[in-house]
Regions:
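Short beta-strand-centered segments that line the small-molecule binding cleft or hinge
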Residues: 69-96
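Flexible loop residues that form catalytic
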Residues: 9, 78, 199-200
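Bacterial Sec-dependent N-terminal signal peptides
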Residues: 1-31
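N-terminal pre-domains immediately preceding structured catalytic cores
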Residues: 58-62, 73-75
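Exported/periplasmic ABC-transporter solute-binding proteins
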Residues: 20-55, 63-67, 89, 101-309
Length: 309
């Protein structure tokens, strides 16, 4: 009798363990992990929060630093090779802009004060190049300034460089590892430091004004636009100007989501992003795509959903 009771207890224990394991597997399969550069994470967090209200059964989370099980990867248009096993199937949801900056009140800011640098002069300031155009007078003051650029794979360094026809390996100065926020940290420590960054890292997203410790380096734009590229600019004014037309001295690049496996949950999330999530782009410092390109992205996801039915 005791043996029979013991056998029943063991069988019950095995069954309960299997149920728990099954539930655990089911729960983990409902989580999708998204990897993103830090400047885009506040937008991703907003998306995840809002999407969970419409689809509570599917959970999206921001991936941690060294995490391997990634379902979605936020990438830039210039990242044209497969990374971390992800395909080049990319759905673009917006654009980001990169501006030249220095620390407010620094010696570098004083050197650059009142200057309106065009593309050729910006190349001279930021890059190692002895083959500058002959019509560009060499500015000796630039030589004492220290350029800080990023070396991280998610840095906007390559976007800034490509806008001037340069490679990221051709920057003068020092390379900073880690997130691009460390570029502004470097400026705070070096009075001669000069760098660049994406708008969400330059502006306070709540006040919509430039962060008090930073200063935008003057660029050569039409007089009517000068205030939009000054330290008195608001984030929304600047975004509006950049959406109206390209400014040669400002790097603007598409940002999108690359995915490894496009299951129903991922595709439905992407469809929501393109139809509802993009309304938060401006709030978090990103530009919207033009209407034609935005529609192309919506159609792309719709076609994938249709093909899977």
């Amino acid at each position: 009798m005791r043996r029979l009771v013991l056998a029943i207890v063991i069988l019950l224990g095995i069954n309960i363990s299997n149920i728990w394991a099954g539930n655990s597997s089911s729960n983990s399969s409902n989580v999708r992990y998204v990897k993103a550069p830090r400047f885009a994470r506040p937008l991703l967090e907003k998306w995840i929060s809002e999407y969970s209200k419409t689809q509570p059964g599917i959970e999206f989370q921001i991936a941690k630093g060294g995490q391997d099980d990634i379902d979605l990867n936020v990438v830039f248009d210039n990242q044209g090779v497969n990374t971390e096993g992800f395909s080049r199937a990319v759905v673009y949801f917006g654009e980001f802009a990169v501006l030249p900056i220095t620390a407010s009140g620094s010696e570098a800011a004083k050197v650059l004060e009142g200057k309106h640098l065009n593309s050729k002069k910006l190349k001279q300031l930021y890059f190692l190049n002895d083959d500058f155009d002959e019509d560009v007078k060499k500015i000796k003051q630039f030589e004492k300034l220290v350029i800080y650029s990023g070396s991280n794979a998610t840095s906007v360094t390559s976007s800034f460089a490509h806008n001037f026809g340069e490679e990221s390996s051709n920057f003068r100065g020092k390379r900073i590892s880690g997130d691009d926020l460390f570029l502004t940290t470097a400026l705070a420590k070096d009075p001669l430091g000069v760098s660049f960054n994406a708008l969400p890292n330059i502006f306070d997203l709540k006040s919509r004004h430039i962060k008090s410790n930073l200063s935008i380096i003057g660029i050569d734009v039409k007089k009517s636009l000068e205030s939009s590229f000054s330290d008195n600019a608001t984030l929304d004014d600047l975004i509006g100007v950049l959406e109206e037309g390209k400014v040669q001295e400002v790097a603007v690049e598409k940002i999108g989501v690359s995915y490894n496996q496009a299951d129903d949950a991922v595709n439905q999330f992407l469809q929501w992003v393109l139809t509802a999530g993009v309304k938060y782009n401006h709030e978090f410092g990103l530009l919207n795509l033009d209407n034609k390109l935005a529609q192309v992205q919506i159609d792309k996801v719709k076609n994938i959903l249709t093909a899977q039915k």
